[in-house]
Amino acid sequence: MSLLRTHNLTAYYGDFQALFGVDIELNAGETIAIIGANGAGKTTLMRSISGVLRNASNSVLFEGSAIGAKESDAVMRDGIAMVPEGRKLFPSLSVKENLLIGTYGRKVKGYWTLEAIYDLFPILQEKADAPATSLSGGQQQMVAIGRALISNPKVLLCDEISLGLAPVVIKDIYAAFPKIKASGASVIVVEQDIAQALKVADRVYCMMEGRVTLSGKPSDLTRDDIQDAYFGRITK
């Protein structure tokens, strides 16, 4: 049984339909990448899975149970955490306080302690008491990833975590992914950068205009396959 899957998932913003029958599957210990141009529906898919965009059709299944009608806090307690696009840190809080914000009032057990986050991103320990907004964009993204991990999720959703960052910073962030995977977390990465997605993913889904246009292992997909699917010229 897959750890998480969507079945014929649709999503709307008012009368506008953003997703059309999307089927994806994430197995335990796996990293999958969702690629596509702006407006393809990638972020809407992540918002549907995380519970931010509530889905009354119960088309999102986590460990075999529907989560579509749950609030995002309940989804997080069930074991899904999201690193949202744009980082969205609390500007009045320190780096350490931002990392711990999701643990207040909860007993969280697992690999990802504050010390483990500092081991993953040592710069965050150096700047633990600094205001989060005093950090560079890449460092703020590390805080956002650490904040999601510290809840010890079974599934980590990463939405456009490389957006607006320099290539060297993106490389540093993705260098942490083998350790994240080794901790037992399964990961869904949303990326516009096709090359980066192919490096990190066990399987790739390409989206265009709210639909999945291609899926498969990176080793099984040709550059032409991916480019055609990215621009919506084929459906598989």
Question: Could you tell me what each predicted segment is?
Answer:
Residues 2-236:
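Glycine-rich phosphate-binding loops of nucleotide-dependent enzymes
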